[in-house]
Amino acid sequence: MREYQRLKGFTDNLELRRRNRATVEHYMRMKGAERLQRHSLFVEDGCAGNWTTESGEPLVFRGHESLRRLAEWLERCFPDWEWHNVRIFETEDPNHFWVECDGRGKALVPGYPQGYCENHYIHSFELENGRIKRNREFMNPMQKLRALGIAVPQIKRDGIPT
């Protein structure tokens, strides 16, 4: 059994924490065409993706080229997207941050009627020396369905106390 290593809390690695937090803040502030450069915030083989998909498997984009193509698609399909009500949480690990926020913007996804998406998000950022290694995005998939004009199934909750 591994011995538990006690961390120093949030007072260790202050310069690394500052650098990593600045990257997370920059990522969350990016809007419009600026998002086309978001891949530059990642390590070369870094990845980002949505962990709440209809398949139950994450949709992951790995490497600068894949992340760049994703940004182009996002710019076309969600042109005015913005994060707001952003709250950034540090952890005991100076290389791991969590973000809770809301997102909103037009949804112009091919094959679906034009819509508007508003959702609540949780992001996990794993970083290395100020660059993102992995960004995982979690949100309510029912809100995504509504934004795309897809009927949302009704879940029966008979017997659940209210």
Swiss-Prot record:
It comes from the Bacteria. Pathway: Antibiotic biosynthesis; phenazine biosynthesis. One of its GO terms (biological process) is phenazine biosynthetic process. Keywords: Antibiotic biosynthesis, Virulence. Pfam families: PHZA_PHZB. Induction: In liquid cultures (aerobic), phz2 operon is induced by quinolone signal via 2-heptyl-3-hydroxy-4-quinolone (PQS). In biofilm (microaerobic), phz2 operon is induced by quinolone signal via 4-hydroxy-2-heptylquinoline (HHQ), a precursor of PQS. Involved in the biosynthesis of the antibiotic phenazine, a nitrogen-containing heterocyclic molecule having important roles in virulence, competition and biological control. PhzA2 (operon phzA2B2C2E2F2G2) has a role in the biosynthesis of the phenazine during both planktonic growth and biofilm development, and in host infection during biofilm development. Belongs to the PhzA/PhzB family. This is Phenazine biosynthesis protein PhzA2. It comes from Pseudomonas aeruginosa (strain ATCC 15692 / DSM 22644 / CIP 104116 / JCM 14847 / LMG 12228 / 1C / PRS 101 / PAO1).
